Amino acid sequence: MNLELPKAEIRSATRVVGGPVTPRKGPPKFKQRQTRQFKSKPPKKGVQGFGDDIPGMEGLGTDITVICPWEAFNHLELHELAQYGII
């Protein structure tokens, strides 16, 4: 009496023979830019249109001391400040 079980054959992955051989490439590598490049110019400090050219504001002049640096950009929205890296 034969008590041996038949051995299962282990096959490796099927290889295509005779086809073009191409080396396998990894995922594409992206280089990060070191400097930011903006399509438009960054905003200038100061309130636009403020000074002696506004009727009723002649006595104030244009010499305004900025106490907080955010006051220099108070004419801009937060998303504009973030776009140019100010905040």
Swiss-Prot record:
Residues 26-44 have a biased composition (Basic residues). One of its GO terms (molecular function) is 3',5'-cyclic-GMP phosphodiesterase activity. Keywords: Acetylation, cGMP, Hydrolase, Sensory transduction, Vision. Oligomer composed of two catalytic chains (alpha and beta), an inhibitory chain (gamma) and the delta chain. The modification N-acetylmethionine is found at residue 1. Belongs to the rod/cone cGMP-PDE gamma subunit family. One of its GO terms (cellular component) is photoreceptor outer segment membrane. This is Retinal rod rhodopsin-sensitive cGMP 3',5'-cyclic phosphodiesterase subunit gamma. InterPro entries: PDE6_gamma, PDE6_gamma_sf. Its EC number is 3.1.4.35. Signal peptide: none annotated. One of its GO terms (biological process) is positive regulation of epidermal growth factor receptor signaling pathway. It comes from Cavia porcellus (Guinea pig). It catalyses: 3',5'-cyclic GMP + H2O = GMP + H(+). Participates in processes of transmission and amplification of the visual signal. cGMP-PDEs are the effector molecules in G-protein-mediated phototransduction in vertebrate rods and cones.
